[in-house]
């Protein structure tokens, strides 16, 4: 399973690249989507590689992401009780394992918002106009996407930047 994060905005972007980002549901900076890895997805990612970063997400990071940032439609938090009713999985960990193993697609879960909003990363991005291979942030980063996601999930802070009680 791939985690894809948009790191650059819309200014000066070609229309076909913007359309591809829209098809990937990456309309704003710091939005994340979870995608299955296939030839079509790889082609789309190659087209928008200068505006997004992506890599393979692991079970631990996905569990933390589901627990802290995943929302139902209506912007309600995903709780353990509702998780069991909607997905049939008893815990976040079981759902994360099933998603990573490809047993279920994230888009198949009913009433879950397909785009996950994240905070800007702690200590910022590297150079957003430079590829990850050259010391920047854009493009494929493999397993290192997990470090970036963990820097973007700040426990105890809600989506509006307010401290949760």
UniProtKB/Swiss-Prot annotation:
GO terms for cellular component: cytosolic large ribosomal subunit. One of its GO terms (molecular function) is structural constituent of ribosome. It comes from the Archaea. Keywords: Ribonucleoprotein, Ribosomal protein. It holds the Pfam family Ribosomal_L30. InterPro entries: Ribo_uL30_ferredoxin-like_sf (IPR036919), Ribosomal_uL30 (IPR039699), Ribosomal_uL30_arc (IPR005997), Ribosomal_uL30_euk_arc (IPR035808), Ribosomal_uL30_ferredoxin-like (IPR016082). Coiled coil: none annotated. One of its GO terms (biological process) is maturation of LSU-rRNA from tricistronic rRNA transcript (SSU-rRNA, 5.8S rRNA, LSU-rRNA). Belongs to the universal ribosomal protein uL30 family. Part of the 50S ribosomal subunit. This is Large ribosomal subunit protein uL30. The gene is rpl30.
